Amino acid sequence: CVRARTHAHEDDLMTTVLIGGSRRLALLNDIIRFRADNIIRQHFAVVIGDANGTDKAMQSYFASKGYRNITVYCMADRCRNNLGDWPTRHISASRQKRDFAYYATKDEEMARVASYGFMIWDGKSKGTLNNILNLLKQQKKVLVYFSPDQSCHTLGSSDDLAVLLRKCPSIDRRKFEREFTLSTFAVAEEPGIDL
C-alpha cells in the first residue's frame, strides 16, 4: 500500500485527484497520510467535499501542511467544512431535499473534473462506493484504502471492484447490488497514475 514514484512528470501538472471517503472515518493513519504526502510532493490538484468524517480529516491534514492546491466542493450556498479557507465550487441541485441524491450531484461533478481518485472506504458507505463507480464509469483509476483490513487497492475496472467487494460482508454486498445494480456494471481498465 505504500508505493510512491520518485519523481513527477510534466504531464502530472494537470493531474487532479478526487479525495473522499466514509463519514464514519475521521482518523488518518500513516498509510493515508503517506498517500496524502505523495499528492503534495507531486503538486497534484485536489478536489474534496465538505462533509464531516474523511473529507474533514483530509482537509485538516492538508491545512496542517499548508497545501493550497485544493478546491472544496459544496452544495448550493452552504459549505459545511473548509478548514484551509481554499477556493470553493458551489454545485446546485434541482431537488431541495438533502438526501443521498442531493449530495451525489456534487460527487458527480467532482468525478468529472478529476483525473484520478483516492477513496478511504469502510466497506459500508454507499456514498464512497458511488464515488468509486462515478470514477470507474469515466475510466479513471481509483486508489481505495479499505479500512477493515488496512489494505490499498488500485481499481481500474469492474473486475477490480468485484475483487474488493468480495471483502465486504454479504449483507452489504446485497445492499450495494440493490442500490447500484452492480451486476450490470462493466468497465475495462485504462492506464493511470500512482499515488
What are the roles of these predicted feature ranges?
Residues 2-8:
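Intrinsically disordered, low-complexity terminal segments enriched in Ser/Thr
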Residues 8-10, 105:
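Intrinsically disordered, low-complexity regulatory regions of eukaryotic regulatory proteins
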Residues 11-16, 28:
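Glycine-rich short-loop/terminal segments
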Residues 14-23, 48-49:
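Short, hydrophobic/glycine-enriched beta-strand segments
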Residues 25-188:
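Acidic/glycine-enriched connector segments
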Residues 193-195:
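Intrinsically disordered, low-complexity regions
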